[in-house]
From Swiss-Prot:
Family membership: Belongs to the NRAMP family.
Cellular localization per UniProt: Cell membrane
Topology term for the membrane: Multi-pass membrane protein
NCBIfam families: nramp (TIGR01197), Nramp_1 (NF037982), PRK00701.1 (NF001923)
Residues passing through the membrane, by range: 34-54, 61-81, 108-128, 141-161, 170-190, 212-232, 263-283, 305-325, 361-381, 383-403, 422-442
A molecular function GO annotation: cadmium ion transmembrane transporter activity
Source taxon at top rank: Bacteria
Protein name stated in the entry: Divalent metal cation transporter MntH
Cellular component GO terms, alphabetical: plasma membrane
Organism: Staphylococcus aureus (strain Mu3 / ATCC 700698)
Protein's gene: mntH
Length: 450
């Protein structure tokens, strides 16, 4: 990566929210923390989106608590990578898409944009499917109508944005805590064995030696580090009003943005653990192989003998509510990430409503097409989630490597460049994740062909 500096005529990242939320570096630490509380919530959404649910609950249902260790390691890795995106955004004033475009020729930048766009579409497909299925389960709305309803999220987002980015953060936070409290309640009712749960955080050799466990473990890792989150986080941390030319203020901004990120990712870690624990405590050693998708999980909760008819109905309904909340959350963040990628790579200047409508439509159209082709077959639509995870796996190195190269560049980052230990860990992570994702892609296609 060469040492070109950020050009002064570069468009601000998400310019309608950039530098709009007050941050006073002279205020108390508590006030600074509260000022930066928010961007991490939007990032945490990607770590507990509907695409993660199936993997976590299947992992628990099929292999008990063994994979809790994998969720722990994945979450710690995510914290490191997201902290790097925070430093990139605040230190340079560029988001990851702008930075990548800045250092690439236009033809190569377009290739990177296509890959990033496919990753966001793949992420968004999971949210559209999750929301449509939740609406179907709760209100018996046909899947195709439910998918079309999700397009309205764009206009809701535009309406809320008029009242400031803080309102978006508050709504996302409300949805996150709705999901969190639902699963705390569901896990409490399912009465897991505490010793077995704690033992799950200890590494077991079967994770590597057992092909079935390894496959689910790779799915958890692949679904945890989300490409769109790296683009999103590097942009939305710039919504605060720290001085763009004062390293002391930048250092404070990085500190409190990283604290915010780590707290919110810890919540996402807890939610993913709860999903796995719920799957293990209710379905391990029973009908685990039948838990193929959202419908299976919903009906399994509803008819689980341990819960009884009344509690089963409550648990399954709450599951659908949580799925809807998670899907709505992810559509907000996915749409914002799509805008960041389109602006950063292509430098397009089009109206916000049109840009967001294009981004949303790119995700909804494949779902609608599949619903029409397969005549609303839920199983086929859930299989679309498998392909979406493959796209995410392919896209990951294309954002991780530019992030690593940029944040280790002293000329670009100034005093905020990566320390040696960060470079060692992040390069190790990138290599391991890339190898695991290639393996996951091969395994996925073998599964589909068999």
């Amino acid at each position: 990566m060469n040492n070109k500096r950020h050009s002064t005529n570069e468009q601000l990242s998400l310019d309608e929210i950039n530098n709009t939320i007050k941050f006073d570096h002279r205020s108390s630490n508590k006030q600074k923390f509260l000022s930066f509380l928010g961007p991490g919530l939007l990032v945490a959404v990607g770590y507990m989106d509907p695409g993660n649910w199936i993997t976590s609950m299947q992992g628990g249902a099929q292999y008990g608590y063994t994979l809790l260790f994998v969720i722990l390691i994945s979450s710690l890795s995510a914290m490191l990578l997201q902290s790097m995106t925070v430093r990139l955004g605040i230190a340079t004033g560029m988001d990851l898409a702008q930075m990548t475009r800045h250092y690439l020729s236009r033809p190569i930048a377009i290739i990177f944009w296509i890959i990033a766009e496919l990753a966001i579409i793949a992420t968004d497909i999971a949210e559209v499917i999750g929301s449509a299925i939740a609406l179907n389960l709760l209100f018996n709305i046909p899947l195709i109508v439910g998918a079309l309803i999700t397009v309205l999220d764009v206009f809701l987002l535009l309406f809320i944005m008029k009242y400031g980015f803080r309102k978006i953060e508050a709504i996302v936070g409300t949805f996150i805590f709705t999901v969190l409290f639902i699963f705390i309640f569901e896990v409490y009712i399912s009465s897991p064995q505490l010793n077995a749960v704690l033992n799950g955080f200890i590494p077991h050799s079967e994770i590597i030696t057992n092909n079935g466990i390894l496959y689910i473990a790779l799915g958890i890792i692949g679904a945890t580090i989300m490409p769109h989150n790296l683009y999103l986080h590097s942009s939305i941390v710039q919504s605060r009003t720290y001085s763009r030319h004062n390293n002391e203020e930048k250092a404070q901004a990085i500190k409190f943005a990283t604290i915010d990120s780590n707290i919110q990712l810890s919540i996402a870690f807890v939610v993913n653990c709860l999903l796995l624990v719920l799957g293990a405590s209710l379905f391990f050693n029973s009908n685990a192989d039948d838990l193929g998708g959202f419908y299976d999980l919903y009906h399994a909760l509803k008819t689980e003998p341990v819960l009884g008819a009344t509690m089963g109905a409550i648990m399954s309904t709450l599951f659908a509510v949580a799925l809807l909340a998670s899907g709505q959350n992810s559509t907000i963040t996915g749409t914002l990430a799509g805008q960041i990628v389109m602006e950063g790579f292509l430098r397009l200047h089009i109206p916000n409503w049109l840009r967001r409508l294009i981004t949303r439509s790119l995700a909804v159209i494949p779902v609608i097409v599949c619903l029409i082709i397969f005549k609303g077959n839920a199983a086929k639509i859930e299989q679309l989630l498998v392909f979406s995870q493959v796209f995410l796996s392919i896209a990951l190195p294309f954002c991780l490597i530019p992030l690593q190269l940029a944040t280790s560049n002293k000329d670009l980052m100034g005093p905020f460049y990566n320390k040696t230990w960060v470079n060692i860990i992040s390069w190790t992570l990138i290599i391991i994740l890339s190898i695991l994702n290639v393996y996951l892609i091969v395994q996925t296609f073998q599964e589909l062909q068999s």
